[in-house]
């Protein structure tokens, strides 16, 4: 049986330093990690950056079969107003804004950006699933 959690999210990227610089421009700090891997410790998880070709080699698939950007990562904010601020910071760091901050049918507020290596990020405020004081998210619906 598998516990209901995700410990590490690994993004296959073309240029590790460029990808790391993007997240550092958003205020994230690198964690100590071995050569060939860049990690950012998150609250109860880690975001890892790994060379796309190395990831393909590791799983035994050609890069063309890995897919890229087919998953949306979500960053939840404490306030509705913070959504636009995070989107602006992402754009200033080199992201492409795909959807400006807007109210959502379920009562929240969100927008989307694409990171320089193609990953899709949602920035969202969910008034029904408030973040803990430490920033941890727990789904309480909408």
Could you say what each language-model-derived stretch is?
Residues 19-24, 90, 118:
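Conserved active-site tyrosine of GNAT-family acetyltransferases
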Residues 12-13, 18:
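Long, hydrophobic N-terminal alpha-helical segment
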Residues 1-8, 26-114, 125-142:
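Vicinal oxygen chelate
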């Amino acid at each position: 049986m598998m516990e209901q959690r995700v410990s590490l999210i690994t993004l296959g990227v073309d240029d590790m330093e460029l990808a790391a610089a993007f997240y550092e421009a958003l205020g994230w700090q690198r964690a100590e990690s071995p050569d060939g891997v860049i990690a950012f410790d998150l609250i109860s998880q880690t975001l890892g950056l790994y060379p796309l070709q190395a990831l393909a080699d590791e799983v035994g698939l050609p890069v063309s079969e890995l897919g890229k950007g087919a998953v949306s990562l979500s960053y939840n904010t404490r306030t509705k107003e913070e959504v636009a601020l995070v989107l602006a910071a992402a754009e200033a760091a080199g992201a492409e804004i795909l959807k400006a901050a807007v109210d959502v049918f379920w009562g929240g507020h969100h927008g989307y950006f694409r990171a320089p290596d193609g990953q899709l990020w949602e920035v969202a405020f969910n008034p029904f699933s408030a973040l803990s004081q430490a920033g941890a998210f727990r789904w309480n619906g909408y």
